[in-house]
Amino acid sequence: KDNKIMEKVYTVKEVREQVKAWRREGLTVGLVPTMGYLHEGHASLIKKAVEQNDKVVVSVFLNPTQFGPTEDLEAYPRDFEADCKLCESIGAAMVFHPEPSEMYAPDFCTWVDMDVLSKTLCGKSRPIHFRGVCTVVSKLFNIVTPDRAYFGQKDAQQLAIIRRMVRDLNMDIEIVGCPIVREEDGLAKSSRNTYLNEEERKAALILSKAVFLGKKMVEDGETSAVAVKEAMIKKIESEPMAKIDYVEAVDGLSMQPVEEIKAPVLVAMAVYIGKTRLIDNFIVE
């Protein structure tokens, strides 16, 4: 691959022109949609994209429509310079970093919403979240028209929802899910980990401990969702700083609760450590 200097682009028009030029050369295009403050989890997505496509676009857009009124949009960490360095070092061809006004006109009123999948798990406590996700991802797909798009399995419900959206709306894009990347001690990498103080950071390990416990139970032959959930809940409750939002076992495609654990099943959780809401999961394939 030619190590041409990575482009930083701020408008839809510029992205379209560049992608059209690549298409004329017969090049394939991969998209990695992010909200910025990139970490090794994002890096693994970008690497995969660079392996599988001639050109890779990374979008860095802190999407306001997927945050509720009381959520952490204003506090969400940002470091665009560092994001660009990371993207360039891995071999991305372009970073697309639009202003909210470039993505949402003042009279914007069209939403991509989902009846079923977005109402469970994270959708219960974040009711408009997935509407914002689906809408912005649809827009990015229309702007970039990628051959493939890359998402992390840490946001497993988001991944399932995007796969369904692509199927239901006949979007000609291959969705590639990439495994969770963890810190050495097991904590799933997340931009929100930066909110944790030292004590909370230690307490946050209870999520991955519960995930590994549940995973081991399933590997050892446990098929009762209730048994796995109860063991995981008990584990999380042993950490006084942890407050459970949910621990659920759901069908990997429909996101509906299951009683029996047989593939494909997603076992997912959201847990507050202090004020910070963290998620983790494992997939039974």
Regions found by a protein language model. Name each.
Residues N3-M241, V250-G252:
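Nucleotidyltransferase catalytic core that binds NTPs
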Residues A231-E285:
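Phosphate/ribose-recognition catalytic cores of enzymes acting on nucleotide-derived substrates
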